[in-house]
Amino acid sequence: MKKKYDVGILGVWFGCNYGSIATYYSLYYAIKNMGKSVLMIHRPYLDHFEEASMEDRHSLRFARAHYDISPAYHVDEIGKLNDVCDAFVLGADQLWKYNVTKIFGHSYFLDFVNRKNKKISYATSFGTDRFKAPKEYMWKAVKCLRRMNYVSVREKVNVNMCEKLLGIRAEHVLDPVLLCESNCLGDIANESDRKVKLHCSLYT
C-alpha cells in the first residue's frame, strides 16, 4: 500500500450484525474527528482467505462505502502494515475470547506490530470474567498485552482480571457508540431507502 495512515483499526467490523457495524463506525468516526486518517484492517487469516464468500455481506457493502480498507493479509504478512500505519487501535468487541479469534493466531493481540508503532486497545473484551485459552496461547497473548501502550476494556470485571491475574493495568471505558454525537449514526441511517414505521429503541 502506498498511502500512509495515522491509525489502523483492527477488529471484526466485517461481521454480519448491525451492532458491530454501529460499534466500529462509531470508533472510526471518533478517531476521524480527532483529525486522524484511518485505515480499517481487513480480516487476517491463517489458511485460505475466501474473499468471494464475504463479498456480498451487508457489512462489507457498508464498509466499502465509508472506509479505506486494507487488503486481507496472512498472519505471517500482516506486519507489512507497520510501514502503512503509525498506530494500531484494537477494538471494540470480544476480540480476546479464544473461541472467537483463535483462527486469527495472535493478530488480535497485535503481535505483528513493531515496538516503534503505538499499540492501543479500546473497549476490548474477553467475553467472560476469565481468560480461557490453552496455556501456551495464553502466555503469548499476555506477553503481547504487556507490550501495549494502553489497554482498555469494555466490562468492568475485566479491569480486575487484567490487574490481578495477568499483571496488566487496564481502564474501563465506554463502548464507542456512546462516544459520538447523535448525528454520527443518524446520518448513516438516513442513507437507507427502506420504509419503516416509527418505533422506539432502547440501548442498555
How should each PLM-predicted stretch be described?
Residues 1-204:
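Active-site anion-handling motifs in enzyme catalytic cores
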